[in-house]
Amino acid sequence: MVSASREIAASSDLIFELIADPAQQPRWDGNDNLASAPAGQRIRRVGDVFTMTLTKGSIRENHVVEFEEGRLIAWTPAEPGQAPPGHLWRWELEPAGTSRTRVTHTYDWTRLTDENRLPRARATTADRLRASLDRLAALAEEPSLPG
């Protein structure tokens, strides 16, 4: 398991919208793994499933397993029609004063059952998670965005 945190000069509501809308995720993905996601998949609850096209062209179904509006979201990716193999992406947001938010991004592969995925899972470093946080911060802190 690996995680990274940083403070972002934006409201938790604004940051959460960038995370909870899968169509926005390729804009801030620090792993350079996400190519696109169809619009209209805004995550609203545990049990939601959203699809994403990866940069290598494959499709992933992401199963939302944790959700608290404005504060917490986590999903487990899977190949279409398959059970998730056990790795999880989590985002936690905590207000840190007026229009500031502490954001923690975690990748947890401790329950990963597919041995073939372990090398790539272990290659996901805190630096890559920080890259996502930095890109997310750059978008959220843009003066043109409300929040």
What are these regions (language model features)?
Residues S36-Q82, R102, A138-G147:
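Glycine-rich portal/gate segments that line the openings of hydrophobic small-molecule binding cavities
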Residues M1-Q41:
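Hydrophobic ligand-binding cavity/cleft-lining segments
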Residues R6, R60-E66, P77, H87-P95:
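Hydrophobic/aromatic beta-strand elements that line small-molecule binding cavities or substrate pockets
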Residues S12-D13, V65-G70, E92-R102:
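A short, structured loop/turn motif at beta-sheet edges
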Residues S3-S5, V49-T51, A74, R90-E92, ...:
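Beta-strand secondary-structure signal
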Residues E79-A131, G147:
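Beta-strand/loop substructures that line and gate deep hydrophobic ligand-binding cavities in soluble
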